[in-house]
Amino acid sequence: MFAPIDPVKIPVFSDPWITMATLSGYLLFVLKLGPKIMENRKPFHLSGVIRVYNIFQILYNGLILVLGVHFLFVLKAYQISCIVSLPMDHKYKDRERLICILYMLNKFVDLVETIFFVLRKKDRQISFLHVFHHFAMAFLGYLYYYFHGYGGVAFPQCLCLLNTAVHVIMYAYYYLSSISQELQRSLWWKKYITIAQLVQFGIILLHCTITLAQPDCAVNRPLTYGCGSLSAFFAVIFSQFYYHNYIKPGEKSSKQSAIHKNL
């Protein structure tokens, strides 16, 4: 069995078998067992639990965001244009580990959101995009930690400034929309969360491209290619989601209005 490249392990998920069992159980429950169990049951009312979960996610992601910004722009532990993991004896190595551990654990906390969808029978929200995104972030992030170690190109660039910032906005929206139907209808910025996610993927892809264009940048190039490719793939499927949910309905409304005018 391979051993993690960094001797400092992630709490709970240091054993790859626990990680694989957790992710396999997630897929089995949200795609098969959960819907089967809920088939003849009424949806659970989890409003209070979900509000607490949303507040927790806002605070958790906010903490990682603050730590990440401090790490990048106050401590200046990385050269932004060429992000390489800190050596084991670097004075900021423990800070790098802490941020990455918090981020990795949060990717497993994110899986709970899909379980809420199953228990509330929100089948439409259990889409390929949703399940794949959550699974891939936890699974690929874990493989990155296990074989590469903490930090480097796949972490603080998207972790500190982009991914966690988007999640703070997203969970703030979820919390506010859960308070009442009236407040939910007044929240006009839902689609801009998806736009922010698309901008995030674009920035990550651009950063990976700039990194790879520097022959003297000592990053792990296959991992950088992988990070950029995954960002491009996410950009495509999130763009499809945006089109089908925000552009296409408007096109249908415009066509219907034109038909009525011509009658």
Swiss-Prot record:
GO biological process, any: sphingolipid biosynthetic process
Catalytically driven reaction(s): a very-long-chain acyl-CoA + malonyl-CoA + H(+) = a very-long-chain 3-oxoacyl-CoA + CO2 + CoA
Chain segments annotated as transmembrane: 10-30, 55-75, 98-118, 135-155, 159-179, 193-213, 223-243
GO cellular component: endoplasmic reticulum membrane
Pfam families: ELO (PF01151)
Tissues where the protein occurs: No expression in adults.
Membrane association type: Multi-pass membrane protein
GO molecular function: fatty acid elongase activity
EC number assigned by the record: 2.3.1.199
Enzyme class: transferase
Further facts: In D.melanogaster, functions in the elongation of long-chain C27 and C29 hydrocarbons. However, no expression is detected in D.simulans adult females or males which synthesize only short-chain C23 and C25 hydrocarbons.
Biological role stated in the UniProt entry: Condensing enzyme that elongates saturated and monounsaturated very long chain fatty acids, to yield products up to 30 carbons in length.
Cross-referenced PANTHER family: ELONGATION OF VERY LONG CHAIN FATTY ACIDS PROTEIN-RELATED (PTHR11157:SF116), FATTY ACID ACYL TRANSFERASE-RELATED (PTHR11157)
Protein name: Very long chain fatty acid elongase F
Species name: Drosophila simulans
